[in-house]
C-alpha cells in the first residue's frame, strides 16, 4: 500500500491536481492507494467515483497541516504502508515516520547556485 499526501487534488482544477489524480489512478491499478487531501467544496461526488480511498482534511490552513500529519501518523500505526508519495515537501514536513518518502519537486523548489 502507498499513501499519497497532497494539498492539490481534484475536483480542484490545475496542473498539480491533474498530476496527483493521474498518479493515484494509475498506481491503484497495481497497488492499494489511500489519498490524504485537503478538503474542497463539492468533493463527495468526485471522491465516490474513485477506485481508491480518499480522506479529506479540512479546517483553517494553519492548523490543517498539523491535523493532516497527525491523522497520517495514526493511520501508519495501524496499516502496512510501503511508502508515502507527496506533492510538495510541505506535505511531508510534519510526519513522524521512517517510511520511504517520495516527493515530487517542481518549479522554484529546487535551490541551486547559479
Each language-model region and where it sits:
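N-terminal strand-loop element at the rim of the active site
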Residues: 8-13, 19-64
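Active-site proximal beta-strand in glycosyltransferases
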Residues: 2, 83-85, 97-111
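Short His-centered aromatic/hydrophobic patch
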Residues: 85-91
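Short glycine-rich, flexible loops that bind phosphorylated cofactors or substrates
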Residues: 62-63, 92-93, 110
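A conserved, positively charged/aromatic
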Residues: 28, 76-78, 102-105, 109-114
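A short, charged, and often flexible helix/loop element on the N-terminal side
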Residues: 49-85
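Short, charged/polar "capping" segments at the starts of alpha-helices
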Residues: 41-46, 93-94, 113
